């Protein structure tokens, strides 16, 4: 690389770095609002895992996934605890919909694992509907073995990939 090219690259990098303004969000990253004001609830930041109306609460406090045994779509007792929490959250936060993703480990054919992921997602959906969540607020999709959490060849690792994940979205229809 020629010296002039190196200098031009350095100048461009410095120019881009100068465009950033870390102070524009205030000391706490809250857009200068200090994390208080409208939408704040007694010191709990909106969107935090401590806010029971936040999607972060369901993801980090209740749990967003249910694990399954090999070749199974039957919900375990541990899974029922998670799904009961999800159902309660969805019943109390009607502004959200959910997509339930079914997943499988890498063992088996692609077609088999897509079908297994669909059965897992449907099992979760049916349970949430049985707890009172409107069916119209739930969608399912199966990824089979196409989106593993980890790529591996041990049972402990495979177990993490046999799951159904509840992904929340704001309901923009109403």
Give residue spans per PLM region.
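A non-catalytic structural micro-motif
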Residues: 94-103, 118-149, 162-174
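Periplasmic peptidoglycan-binding/tethering modules of Gram-negative envelope proteins
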Residues: 20-97, 171-174
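Bacterial N-terminal signal peptides that target proteins for export
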Residues: 1-8
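Short beta-alpha junctions and helix-cap segments that line functional grooves
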Residues: 150-154
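A generic structural micro-feature
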Residues: 156-160
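Extracytoplasmic/secreted proteins, especially bacterial periplasmic and envelope-associated proteins
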Residues: 78-85, 111, 119, 123, ...
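C-terminal motif of bacterial Sec signal peptides marking the signal peptidase cleavage site
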Residues: 15-18
């Amino acid at each position: 690389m020629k010296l002039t090219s190196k200098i031009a690259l350095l100048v461009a990098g410095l120019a881009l770095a100068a465009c950033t303004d870390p102070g524009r969000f205030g000391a706490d990253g809250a857009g200068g609002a200090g994390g208080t004001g409208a939408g704040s609830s007694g010191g709990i930041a909106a969107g935090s895992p401590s806010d029971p109306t936040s999607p972060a609460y369901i993801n980090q406090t209740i749990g967003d996934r249910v694990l399954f045994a090999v070749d199974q779509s039957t919900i375990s007792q541990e899974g029922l605890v998670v799904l009961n929490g999800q159902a309660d959250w969805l019943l109390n936060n009607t502004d959200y919909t959910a997509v339930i993703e079914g997943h499988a480990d890498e063992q088996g054919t692609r077609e088999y694992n897509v079908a297994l992921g669909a059965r897992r997602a449907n099992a979760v959906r049916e349970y949430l509907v049985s707890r009172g969540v409107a069916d119209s607020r739930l969608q399912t999709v199966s990824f089979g073995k196409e989106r593993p959490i980890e790529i591996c060849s041990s049972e402990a690792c495979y177990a993490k990939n046999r799951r159904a994940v509840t992904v929340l979205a704001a309901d923009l229809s109403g």
